[in-house]
Amino acid sequence: MSYDWEKMRKEEWPVLETMTFLDAACVSFAPQRAVRAVKEFADMTARQDEANSSAHHIALDDMRHKAYAEAQKLLNADPEEIALIESTSHGLNIAAQGIQLEDGDNIITTNLEFIQVALPWCVMRKEKNIDIRVCKPEDERFTVESFAALADERTKIIVMSTIEWCNGWQTDLKALGNFCKEKGIMLVVDAVQQLGVTKIDTKECHIDLLAAGGHKWLNSPYGTGVLYVNKESLSKIKQSYAGYLNTTVPEGGWGAYWENPAAPSVNNWTFPETARKYEIGGTSNYAGAVALGESLGLVNEIGIENIEARVRQLATYCMDRIEEIGGTVITHRDPGHFGGIVIARLYDDLDVDRMILKKLHARKIFIAQRFTDYVGGFRISCQYFNNEKDIDTMIEGMKDLIQEIGREPD
C-alpha cells in the first residue's frame, strides 16, 4: 500500500519546515490532530455541558477511551490487557513492585540498557538478597542464547529493551518470549524505542508486561504511555495501587453512590481482573491520554507494516550515506533486527564528535549522542515523518564540518 508521506508530514508536522529533526528516540513532536484534541479537551474544562459536575468529570474521563482502543489494536491485544500509565518508568515500577521475588532469586538484564530499566530492581537489592545478572552481547547482538547462558532455576525475570537505545539492536521477541514461557521466567520489556516503529504482535510474542511512554516514537506529549499485561499474567503481578477509579464501578455509577446516605467510607472493594487495576485510579492525565489516542490513531491509520517498511528504508539510506562520507556505522543491518535508530561515529576522538554535534545543532540539525558501557555514538532517529532530504541535509552538514576539521573520519 502506497502512502503520501509528504502530505502527512506537511499537514501534521509543520514544525519540520523550520529544522532538520532526527531525534525522535529522545523526544518527538505531537501531530496537529493531537494538538487539536488537547485544545478541545482544554475547552471542555472551561465549561460544563453536562447535567452536573460528576457527569462532567465522567465525560472528561471518557475522552481517554480512544487511547485504550488504539493501543489494543496496535499491539493486537485483548481489551483487558491494556492500561494507561504515566511513562515507561511507571510501567517498569509496576513490574518490580508486582512480581514477587525472594532472597536468592535473580533477574537478567543487559549492559546496554537505559538506566531506568534495571533501576527498580537495583533499589530492591537494598532490601532483598537478589542478584541482577547482566547479559553482554556477542558482537553487539543479543540472542536467546545470550540470555539462556545466564538463566537458572532461580531466574524469575528477564527485563530488557526491545530496541536498545545506544546501538539500535532489535531483539527477537518471539524467540525470547518462547524461551521465557518454557522456563517459567517473566518477560518484562521496555518498548519505548519500538512501539510505533516496528510491529509488536502480543499474540505471537509471549510478553508478560510491556511498558512504553508516548513521547518518543508515538509522537505524543509527555506524561502518558501504554501498559500491556498478558491476561495469563494478571494473577501473577500484584496490584501496586488502589484507587477508587480502578475498582469495580458500583451499581448505578459513582454519582448515585455518592448521593446514597448509607454509602460507607470503608468497604470490601473489588477490582476487575484487567490491566487497568495497575493504574493509579485517581484523576489522571486526561489531556495526555486524549493526545495519545490521536497519535496512536495516526499510527494505526497509516498501518504499522507501512511505518516499519518506511523507517527501515530511511535507516538503511542513512547508514549508506554515513558510510559514503567515511563514518563508522555501529547499528547492525541484520534483517528484522533494527528499527529507526542508527548509531554512528565519525572520529575516534569523542571530543571531536561532540564538537560536530554542537555545530550541527547550531545549524538546526538535531541528532543526539548516546553511550552505555562504551557502546554508542551519534544517535540518528529515522522516524516515519522524516525523508531522505532530512538525512541529506545532515550529511551535508557533516561533510562541511569534516572539511573544516581538515582530516578524513577515522
Language-model segment annotations:
Residues M1-D410:
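Pyridoxal 5′-phosphate
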